[in-house]
Amino acid sequence: MQLDRVIAVRTDKTVFKDGDRCVKVFGGAYDKADVLSEALNQARAEEAGLPVPRVLEVGVVNGRWAIVSDLIRGTTLDETLERDPEGCIARLAAMQADLHRAPCPILPRLRDRMVRRIQQTELPATVRYELCARVENMPQKHQLCHGDFRPSNVMTDENGKCWLLDWKEAARGDGAADAARTCLTLRMSGRGSLADNYAACYCEKSGTDRESLRRWLPMVAAARLTSARAQERALLMTWLKEIGVV
């Protein structure tokens, strides 16, 4: 294996180019089960006919677990967002709406994962109980949810085709919760106006009621606390206080 160059560096993982292959090498925080789960999610999305890089193998590189996939040559929507925000937001929303209409393979339940993560936070017990109860009372749906649908996880290749990357958080559940997380991600990155535009665009393309997204936001934000870095966690807590959750 010839790791030609680094393509991307993310939290505790590094993505390398190996000829026509992409090698995602995970850091020590990821165990075997985490990596195999992500590879399985990606393979199931691929088998469902979604635009996903093929999983070629899972192995160990220099003592670290790695997923090897087809290399997609192109740019992420995050790289083009600044020069064409409206076009990127429209394209992103259309892709997520299409994703939620796709046949859903066997995946973990989103609501179970969300409840588990809310329970793991340091929020007051009464707040955790209330938020978990809200999750359980939301409509039960079985849509394919990416779980981390953001501009940096959508790549446009040389032919203009969009590909979905990073399937670690994939689950089945309410697409409105998935879209709410995308809105929250945009807002936490300082793109509040784009988050509002995205919500409107997604609701139009998917036929989702805007209120559904709004109702999911507090639970999505609370569940995000467990994996957020310090700065993002502070922003999430500030926002949860502003809307009266904490």
Where are these regions (language model features)?
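ATP-binding glycine-rich loop module of kinase domains
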Residues: 6-35, 78
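Conserved short submotifs of the Hanks-type protein kinase catalytic core
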Residues: 63-75
